Amino acid sequence: MNDIVKSAWASVKMNTDFICVDTYSGYRSNQLDPLGVQHLSSPDVSDLDLGEMVKDALSHSRFVLPAPRTDIWIHPEVTFDLDLYDSRRTVERYDEWVKKLMVHYGYKTKRALFKDMKSCDICCNHDAITISPTRHEKLEVWGGTGLKGSDNVILSVDSSPTEIGAGLRLALSRCKG
């Protein structure tokens, strides 16, 4: 079955102090990519600059599996990176991400960092960029509870950076919790 579509991903977190745009990579699922980029800015960044941050993060996303497989069809453009899928390293990278933000913005606790934080997932494939808002369910947990597909913001891949930035702001405004 070869219904896998090459995709690129990014994740956006925003609170009252900053917007953080990170590259995510994967194959069907995705996760924070240490080989990607991170952009930090104040929440009042222009739509143009915000859109450029998103485009750059997506451009660094990798279509990647941990290792070659012979038992299933694998998309011909996939690359391989075992470290990206190492669960221990994934936890370490997340902890480093949290620590970096806490130090950079002077937070003393995780609660202060994550208070009122909004999160959007971005997926780019085919001809569309889909920005999905989330619900802040617990301190460090976001999910889709109470959201509908119509809450997603869908843009053409040909959208200008300003349109992408404005679309992200719209999706962030639809975040719950």
From Swiss-Prot:
What the entry lists under InterPro entries is as follows:
CdiI_Proteobact, Cdil-like_sf
Entry's transmembrane regions? none
The record makes one more remark, namely: Encoded in a defective cdi locus that has been inactivated by gene rearragements and deletions.
Subunit:
Interacts with the C-terminal DNase fragment (residues 954-1077) of cognate toxin CdiA-YPIII.
Q: What does this protein do?
A: Immunity protein component of a toxin-immunity protein module, which functions as a cellular contact-dependent growth inhibition (CDI) system. CDI modules allow bacteria to communicate with and inhibit the growth of closely related neighboring bacteria in a contact-dependent fashion. Neutralizes the toxic activity of cognate toxin CdiA-YPIII (residues 954-1077). Does not inhibit toxic activity of CdiA from other toxin-immunity modules.
- Its name, as the record gives it, is Immunity protein CdiI-YPIII
Q: Which organism is it from?
A: Yersinia pseudotuberculosis serotype O:3 (strain YPIII)
| Classification lineage | Bacteria, Pseudomonadati, Pseudomonadota, Gammaproteobacteria, Enterobacterales
